[in-house]
Design a protein with these regions (language model features):
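GST-like domain detector, emphasizing the conserved glutathione-binding G-site
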Residues: 1-128, 132, 137-141, 165
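GST superfamily/GST-like fold recognition
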Residues: 88, 141-178
């Protein structure tokens, strides 16, 4: 078993999907958290100056979704066929497109809150309805893959602080808690 060290800020953010995968697969890893005050000194030492970084036996991997795909590739999380893998990638990329629209770096709290609220009120319900429609009556999003609604939906909900605005009205609570 390789040795894993995940390097990210002391927050959920882009490393959270990696942590979910480690937890789901019961893989032990070092969760190295960087404080914001230390970032200016650390940034120039990293590939492309970005995190998260996953060290695998000393080799640095970067880009959160590439890392997630690497970890999921040899499990049932990534899909069993190339077609299923493409479907998994499409769902993950759809969620990433949505999450990338949030103003995470906005410094002005009132503007940040307004932008968050607009995305949650106007856009999140459509995304969640699309995911609900895509899932339909199936148990899984993709084939019989364990890449299930829990991992997908929790990825979004872990970032949405105001989930009560949409939970229950646009997607059933049981799907979130599954």
């Amino acid at each position: 078993m390789p040795s894993y060290k995940l390097i990210y800020f002391n927050m959920r953010g882009r490393a959270e999907i990696i942590r979910y995968i480690f937890a789901y697969l019961d893989i032990k890893y070092e969760d190295h958290r960087i404080e914001q005050a230390d970032w200016p000194e650390i940034k120039p030492t990293l590939p492309f100056g970005k995190i998260p970084i996953l060290e695998v036996d000393g080799l640095n991997l970067h880009q959160s979704l590439a890392i997630a795909r690497y970890l999921a590739k040899n499990t049932d999380l990534a899909g069993k066929t190339e077609l299923e893998q493409c479907q998994v990638d499409a769902i993950v990329d759809t969620l990433d497109d949505f999450m990338s629209r949030f103003p995470w770096a906005e410094k002005k709290q009132d503007i940040k809150e307004q932008m968050f609220n607009e995305l949650l009120i106007y856009d999140a319900p459509h995304l969640l309805q699309d995911l609900d429609t895509y899932l339909g009556e199936k148990e899984w999003f993709i084939g019989n893959s364990r890449f299930d609604r829990g991992i997908v939906i929790r990825k979004i909900y872990s970032h949405i602080q105001w989930k009560s605005l949409i939970c229950g009205k646009y997607i059933s609570r049981s799907m979130v808690d599954a």
